[in-house]
């Protein structure tokens, strides 16, 4: 189906929605508006896009035009949850019920808006979805700048030192795990965590975590972004109910109970991790087990899938050389000529380009200058400021020859040393750790903090998953120009979600 046909259909949607489209997705809406205006003067009216949005925030919601194209061309389906295996049900105390998302209406079911009757029916079906997007963005505004410090500090702490390896980190996934850790601790143990997360109290943390979760939850048949949480308990211990209820109500945490260290309990634990990450981290999950000494364990996950607003065409792919730290390697590069709305950003030691996703999110690619390593760049305050700046001064509209290697990168890391450098220390020391909100048992400590993540990029879009496992044991030790932006040497990437939340960041040394 041609883009022009879809644009004609767009023209028939109510002025209210079209004006809102300009507000939510200004670049794409203006292009369509300009084309429509040459055929009909009464198109988009005089609505204007907001100015001064943060460079990481591309739009408030998925505009109708983008979703029309995504649904009609890609036939995207949402990630399906709720089908728990019998292995899990045998251990379940409480299983979280995710909010039911209103589906984005398929324009094909409404004759692609070819009549007034179909237009009205589409608008009626569209209204609940639209209301949910507004709610997501109202939650996003509640996040504010309080998390900027955590995003910056943790990205630097967990990505540096990759050397020749790829490294992938999901800040939002680790954030949710740390927020739950704060809930099960007290005293200085809790204070160190909430200080890192940029809040003054656990009550403020709950409001912040709710905003982050709600703003970045999507499962409407077009967009998929699912944050999952779970709590794993012993069957021979009693735990304090208030904190268990808080974890269930605020973090959508499912609770499971059984014999720690048993084969069946570990099978259930691994099943939950695999189900929540679509089976894309099975090799890492295989190594995640709960020991006989485990008092409790927390797990958080994210499953994310999005299509490019403008997909790559595989016929334009070419084989080229990627200059890996381990030596030159041949890889397949995708190509796009960004001749409409392309913007090049730069700093003293890097250049950056944004590629938009069809869910109001973006993926950014940060390329160190020649002679500058990724590790060196991660030590620079400027690149960290770039992640969270309201507006970046060094930018220019350009026609960009964009070359991106197809990649599937993953990593698993131990977060403990990184968390200690970030100021979270007491939970690792059995003589200092305070877990009194969940149990009166003394001498416990955080013995495990593992994080695994994977990001796959191809012609159609992005799929990304991550999990974090934390285990508590008994105490033991302006002018249009052209530029070529060829990502043919190690680079950084970032997938930014609703409300400037970094969903995934990573280092690609070996595409």
Describe every region a protein language model picked out.
Residues 10, 27, 57-81, 470:
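Single-pass transmembrane signal-anchor helices and their membrane-water interface zones
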Residues 70-86, 93, 443, 451-454, ...:
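Non-catalytic interaction/Regulatory regions outside core domains
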Residues 79-193, 476-480, 507-508:
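Flexible propeptides and autoinhibitory/regulatory segments associated with cysteine proteases
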Residues 83-85, 383-389:
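Soluble, non-membrane globular domain cores that form compact, hydrophobic packing
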Residues 88-114, 135, 164-174, 181, ...:
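Non-catalytic, conformational "gating/processing" segments within enzyme and secreted inhibitor domains
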Residues 192-195, 237:
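Mid-length scaffold segments of soluble, non-membrane domains
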């Amino acid at each position: 189906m041609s883009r022009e046909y879809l644009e004609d259909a767009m023209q028939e949607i109510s002025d209210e929605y079209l004006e809102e489209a300009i507000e939510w997705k200004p670049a794409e809406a203006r292009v369509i508006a300009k084309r429509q205006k040459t055929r009909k003067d009464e198109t988009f009216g005089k609505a204007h896009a907001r100015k001064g949005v943060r460079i990481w925030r591309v739009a408030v919601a998925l505009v109708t035009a983008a979703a029309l194209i995504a649904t009609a061309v890609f036939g995207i389906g949402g990630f399906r949850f709720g089908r728990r295996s019998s292995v899990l049900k045998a251990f379940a105390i409480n299983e979280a019920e995710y909010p039911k998302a209103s589906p984005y209406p398929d324009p094909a079911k409404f004759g692609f808006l070819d009549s007034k009757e179909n237009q009205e029916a589409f608008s009626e079906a569209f209204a609940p979805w639209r209301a949910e997007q507004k709610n997501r963005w109202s939650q996003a505004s509640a996040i504010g700048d309080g998390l900027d410090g955590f995003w910056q500090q943790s990205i630097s702490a967990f990505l540096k030192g990759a050397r020749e390896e790829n490294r992938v980190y999901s800040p939002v996934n680790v954030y949710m795990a740390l927020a739950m850790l704060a809930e099960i601790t007290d005293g200085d143990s809790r204070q160190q965590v909430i200080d890192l997360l940029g809040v003054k109290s656990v009550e403020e943390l709950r409001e912040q975590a709710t905003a982050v979760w709600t703003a970045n939850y999507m499962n409407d048949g077009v967009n998929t972004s699912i944050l999952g949480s779970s709590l794993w308990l012993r069957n021979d211990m009693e735990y304090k109910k208030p904190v268990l209820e808080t974890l269930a109500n605020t973090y959508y945490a499912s609770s499971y109970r059984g014999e720690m260290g048993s084969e069946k309990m570990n099978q259930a634990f691994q099943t939950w991790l695999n189900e929540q990450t679509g089976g894309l981290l099975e090799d890492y999950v295989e190594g995640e087990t709960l020991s006989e000494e485990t008092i409790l364990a927390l797990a958080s996950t994210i499953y994310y899938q999005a299509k490019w607003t403008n997909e790559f065409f595989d016929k334009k792919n070419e084989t080229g050389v990627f200059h890996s730290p381990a030596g030159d390697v041949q890889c397949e590069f995708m190509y796009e000529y960004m001749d409409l709305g392309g913007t090049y950003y730069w700093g003293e030691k890097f250049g950056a380009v944004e590629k938009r996703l069809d869910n109001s999110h973006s993926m950014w690619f940060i390329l160190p200058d020649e002679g500058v390593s990724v590790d060196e760049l991660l030590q620079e305050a400027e690149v960290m400021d770039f992640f969270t700046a309201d507006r970046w001064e060094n930018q220019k509209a350009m026609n960009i020859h964009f070359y991106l290697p197809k990649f599937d990168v993953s990593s698993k890391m131990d977060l403990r040393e990184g968390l200690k450098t970030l100021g979270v220390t007491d939970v690792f020391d059995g003589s200092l750790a305070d877990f009194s909100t969940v149990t009166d048992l003394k001498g416990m400590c955080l013995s495990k903090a593992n994080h695994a993540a994977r990001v796959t990029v191809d012609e159609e879009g992005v799929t990304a998953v991550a999990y974090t496992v934390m285990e508590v044991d008994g105490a033991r030790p302006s002018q249009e120009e052209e530029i070529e932006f060829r990502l043919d040497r190690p680079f950084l990437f970032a997938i930014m979600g609703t409300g400037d939340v970094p969903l995934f960041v990573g280092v690609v040394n070996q595409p």
